[in-house]
Design a protein with these regions (language model features):
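Structural preference for solvent-exposed beta-strand-turn elements
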Residues: 1-380
Length: 380
C-alpha cells in the first residue's frame, strides 16, 4: 500500500475512529484501525463489541493495499504534523507502516490485515429512512446525558429510538422520531416531527447502546446535512458525510416511559434559565462530590428559595416570582440533575412543574415543545 493525502483530510476519518478504539482492550486488535486503499480512496474501520465505525476519504492511491496499526498512535502522529502537510502512508515488511511528511518519517509496528475482524457493517441496505441530520443531533444531545452507566441494568444502558408515522392525515413521508433515556432517577425525552424520504411506513423501536450513540456525535460534525438510518438485522446503521456507525441493539425491554412522565404538576413556575442556573451553581457549591446532599427548592407566594446544608456550612438564595401565588411546596433535588437539563435544553426560559416532596418534577420549555425532562426528588 502506498498513498498520499493532505493532513487535514487524513485527520477526519482518524478522529471519527477514536471513540471506538479501546484504550485497554481485552483483544489487542481492538486497539487498531484497519486501513484499506483502493482506486476509490481510503477506508478506515475501527470496531469494538458494540460499535463499528467506517469512514471514507479521497486520496491519491499509488499502490492499493491494506494495513492494521494502532489507531491512537497514528492519530497522534498525524494531528501533530504541520498544517498543510502532505502525508504519505506506505506499508513495508513485517506489517510495518511508514508515515512520511516533508523530512520527517515515523514507523508503526502493525498486524496482518487478515487478523482484523471482518467488516461488520453490511453493505446491503436495510429498512430505514433519510432525514435531516440536525434533528437527530439535537435529540441525541438532549437524551444521551441521562443514560444509565450501571451495567447490571442493560435496558437503561442506551437511548431508545422510536420512529413512527405521524398519522392524523399527515403525508406518508411525515414521521415522528423520538429518543428517550433514563437512569432510574431522571428521564429525558426529545421528539421531532419531520419530513423524510425512503421511509417504509413501519413503526420501529430500538435501544441504541450508549457507546454507539456517543460515536454518532462525531459523524454529525460533518458538512453533510442529511443522515440515513437503516435497520439491518440486530443493528442500527446511521450514515452521514462519508462515515457509517453501526450500533448494537440492546435486546431488552425499555421501561414504559409514558407512565413516568406526569401530565402536569400542582405548581408551575417559569424562570430565566441563566438566572436559575447561576443561583443553583452558587448554592450547590457546598455540595459533596458524592451527590448525597439535596438542594432544597421551596416555592411560596412571590418567590423561590434555594437552600443547601453541608458540614462546611449552608447556603440560601432567593429568586423573585411575582406571578406565583400558589401553594407552598418544598422539594429536594440533586443540583447536578437540574443543571444538566438547563445545559442541554439551552433555551432562554425553563418551566418547572412540582407537586410535593415525593412526586417527580417535570421540566420543559415553550421554545422546545418536543422536549420534556423528569427528575425524581431526593429525601430531605
Amino acid at each position: 500500500m502506498k498513498v498520499r493525502i493532505d493532513k487535514a483530510a487524513l485527520t477526519v476519518p482518524l478522529y471519527r475512529a477514536q471513540g471506538v478504539i479501546s484504550r485497554k482492550p481485552m483483544n489487542n486488535v481492538l486497539a487498531h484501525v484497519h486501513i484499506a486503499a483502493s482506486e476509490d480512496g481510503l477506508v478506515f474501520t475501527a470496531a469494538e463489541y458494540d460499535v463499528t465505525v467506517v469512514a471514507e476519504v479521497a486520496a491519491d492511491v499509488i499502490e492499493p493495499g491494506a494495513a492494521v496499526v494502532n489507531g491512537r498512535s497514528l492519530f497522534d502522529i498525524v494531528r501533530a504534523l504541520p498544517d498543510g502537510a502532505t502525508v504519505q502512508l506506505s506499508t513495508e515488511a513485517n506489517n510495518r507502516l511508514r508515515i512520511e511528511a516533508g523530512r520527517a518519517y515515523y514507523y508503526l509496528n502493525g498486524m496482518a490485515p487478515e487478523e482484523f475482524p471482518p467488516n461488520a457493517i453490511e453493505d446491503t441496505q436495510g429498512r430505514g429512512l433519510l432525514c435531516d441530520k440536525s434533528h437527530l443531533e439535537t435529540m441525541l444531545k438532549r437524551t444521551l446525558f441521562s443514560v444509565s452507566q450501571e451495567e447490571n441494568r442493560p435496558a437503561l444502558n442506551g437511548v431508545l429510538l422510536e420512529i413512527e408515522p405521524e398519522g392524523n392525515g399527515a403525508p406518508a413521508n411525515q414521521v415522528r422520531i423520538r429518543m428517550v433515556s433514563t437512569d432510574g432517577t431522571r428521564l429525558s425525552k426529545a421528539e421531532r416531527s419531520m419530513t423524510v424520504s425512503d421511509y417504509d411506513g413501519q413503526k420501529h423501536a430500538w435501544i441504541l447502546h450508549h457507546r454507539g450513540a456517543s460515536e454518532l456525535q462525531r459523524i454529525f460534525e460533518g458538512a453533510d446535512p442529511s443522515a440515513r438510518i437503516e435497520f439491518v438485522g440486530r443493528n442500527v446503521v446511521i450514515s452521514s458525510d462519508k462515515a457509517r456507525v453501526q450500533v448494537r441493539q440492546i435486546e431488552e425491554r425499555f421501561p414504559d416511559y409514558t407512565r413516568v412522565i406526569p401530565e402536569r404538576g400542582d405548581a408551575s413556575v417559569t424562570l430565566t434559565t441563566s438566572e436559575f442556573m447561576s443561583a443553583v451553581r452558587r448554592v450547590s457549591s457546598l455540595a459533596s462530590s458524592r451527590g448525597d446532599s439535596p438542594l432544597r427548592v421551596e416555592l411560596e407566594a412571590g418567590r423561590m428559595v434555594l437552600e443547601m446544608s453541608h458540614n462546611d456550612g449552608e447556603a440560601h438564595e432567593e429568586i423573585d416570582l411575582p406571578d406565583y401565588q400558589g401553594a407552598k411546596i418544598k422539594v429536594g433535588f440533586n443540583p447536578r440533575f437540574l443543571l444538566d437539563v438547563c445545559n442541554v435544553l439551552g433555551t432562554e426560559h425553563i418551566t418547572l412543574e412540582l407537586s410535593d416532596q415525593f412526586s417527580p418534577c417535570l421540566l420543559h420549555a415553550d421554545e422546545e415543545p418536543g422536549c420534556v425532562f423528569v427528575i425524581m426528588p431526593m429525601r430531605m
